[in-house]
Amino acid sequence: HTQKTVCLNSATAAMEMVLHLLGIGPGDEVIVPAYTYTASASVVTHVGATIVMVDSQKDCVEMDYEQLVEAITEKTKVIVPVDLAGICADVDKIKEIITRPEILSKFTPANDIQDKIGRIVISNDCAHSFGASRHGKMAGEIADFSSFSFHAVKNFTTAEGGALTWNLCFGQDKVERQQVYCNSPIPFIEGETWNEFLYRLSQLFSLHGQNKDALAKTKIGVWEYDI
């Protein structure tokens, strides 16, 4: 459903990569739902931007879209809707909001990429929705960017891993350069050789995801674990 995709070591890495690709940093605001896993918000602090949380609807875990409108300012660069338990967030509603004339007039690009896009970007946390769909569209082809998780507890797993898909102007080469190394303001502990900003999915986990026997064994293991 989309040819623009790259495999990474986690959905967290994918979401952070999006912010780096867009040049998000200090002075920028990223809107996330209050009901979410920590990664959706923590990646915002990784790049030095400001988290703006929007509360859930009264009878639904999705963000309140009236509050979302109120939360958008001239500093807002990205909105991160979160899919939960296989249910896709209403990205179409968010698209309708961010393309309203009064919202478009607020958008203030900070670099050439943001200027080319010309509006707030939707970066969808799809860690829970691999294989899900909404109104005939698959998760991964709805938002500008979609981040997937292949963690051991997900419905498709490589033990550890993730992927990023996108529907914007970026070419594969630009994303793959980010995949190799991504600068971050977070300091590492002196003496450590491990670097969490090497975003590549390991070859072992990649092969696990491509091997039907390995996938079959994983499904059996998940079944036994659930029992």
Spans of features found by a protein language model:
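Short beta-strand segments
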Residues: 9, 80, 222-224
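Buried hydrophobic packing segments
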Residues: 14-19, 162
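PAS/LOV and related PAS-like sensory modules
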Residues: 210-227
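Conserved beta-strand elements of the Class I
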Residues: 6, 29-31, 221
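Conserved N-terminal alpha-helix of the aminotransferase class I/II PLP-enzyme fold
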Residues: 1-10, 35
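PLP-dependent aminotransferase-like
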Residues: 20-129, 133
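Active-site region of PLP-dependent enzymes
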Residues: 112, 129-135, 142-212
